[in-house]
Amino acid sequence: MNNWKSEQVIIVGGGIGGLAAALALARAGIASQVVEQAAELKEIGAGIQLGPNAFWMFERLDLVAPISALAVFPDNLIMRDSITGEEVTRIPLGAAFRKRFRQPYALIHRADLHRVLLDACRASSLIGLDAGQKVVGVDDKSGGVAVTTESGKTYRGAALIGADGLWSTVRQIVVGDGKPKPAGHITYRAVLPTADVPAEYRWNDMAFWAGEKVHLVLYPLRTGELYNLVAVFHSNRYEEGWDSYGDPAELHERFAQTCAPVRMLLDKIESWRMWVLCDRPPIKDWSKGRITLLGDAAHPMLQYLAQGACMSIEDAVCLADKVVAAEGDYAAAFLAYQQARYLRTGRVQIMARVYGEFYHATGVAKELRNMMLGSRTADDAMAGMEWLYDVPKELMQEISPRARGEIAREASA
């Protein structure tokens, strides 16, 4: 191991992005120390969607097998009108989709994905993991970086990665732009045992009912043991943070005009978790010397393209590649990393906002949306996804010949 690789990188944040960064660095032989504020290294939330771009990164991290074992691979992505209940559009996610993108589309419980990453990190001698450590100070003036926590503990390393999410402490040191911006949308999430879902709605699909100013998502998790429900509506009500109990009465009021299947599914849930959706405008500079940001700390995005976790995992792999290329010159590596990422992540941030309004359209705009989507072929739909699901070439170039061979065989099957 080269000497520069043995000097650890400090990673603030033990969520999906932080653990992916630690693992990507470890795969390159670089030591890291993860510092997590929560008392326990675990993930809060329910289901998330994984596009083909995420699976290319899982190839890089040698995680395809354990993630695939816990994921659901849906047959279709289906959008229905939330008022009439009629199907608007359907995108098959089977053989043609896999052939086009050479990877699948999957659904997984957030906690399961986090556990796979955590297990891989625990198995590496190059990764340290500490929970219950809230960062209160950073010093990057002494040829390295020192991170101080509320408990009085100090961590020293060659560089610092802030992967501490939407409410990032490290971002305020690097960017200093205050609190994130509420989007005017509120999300309620819950999971439902499959036995409680009526048989006619036990689809192996990523299904959602869209607009007006609301939408409901339904899809299976944990090999069909659970169904994930996500209900979103417009509201200017604001609560800081994102993990609190929701009010079923508020939800039913907002969805009162929706079709019977939507209202029936909402009635099945007694307890919801609620948070206010927030994001930030895209920026191109999220590094400062030996400190950089990753994932939601760098480019928080709304959920409407289902890319928050995917982008953070892409970030992790790209960042590790740039560190290796710079041979430990972290300031140069971090500038190269943000240069490689800011246009792609900024586009996702902007388009996620656009899709949020698109899904929640009302009146004539809703009719035009349904007409446009209803006239698309599956090929049209997939062509429109290429910018999102095709991984940047520089990340593809590092995939091993063995992995390339396995992917090619699967795509041609």
Which residues does each PLM region occupy?
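Conserved mid-domain beta->alpha element of the FAD-binding
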Residues: 10-39, 161-162, 188, 218, ...
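Conserved N-terminal helical subregion
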Residues: 2-9, 26, 51-193, 236-254, ...
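Conserved N-terminal glycine-rich FAD pyrophosphate-binding loop of Rossmann-like flavoproteins
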Residues: 40-56
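Active-site substrate-recognition segment that forms the wall
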Residues: 204-239, 244, 248-250, 255-256, ...
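A short coil-to-beta-strand element that immediately follows conserved catalytic motifs
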Residues: 181-185, 202-205, 260-276
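C-terminal lid/capping helical subdomain adjacent to the catalytic/cofactor pocket in oxidative enzymes
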Residues: 299-300, 317-325, 360-413
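Acidic/histidine metal-binding catalytic segments
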Residues: 69-72, 256-271, 330-335
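Short, flexible helix/strand-to-coil boundary loops that buttress conserved ligand/catalytic motifs
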Residues: 45, 61-62, 71, 91-92, ...
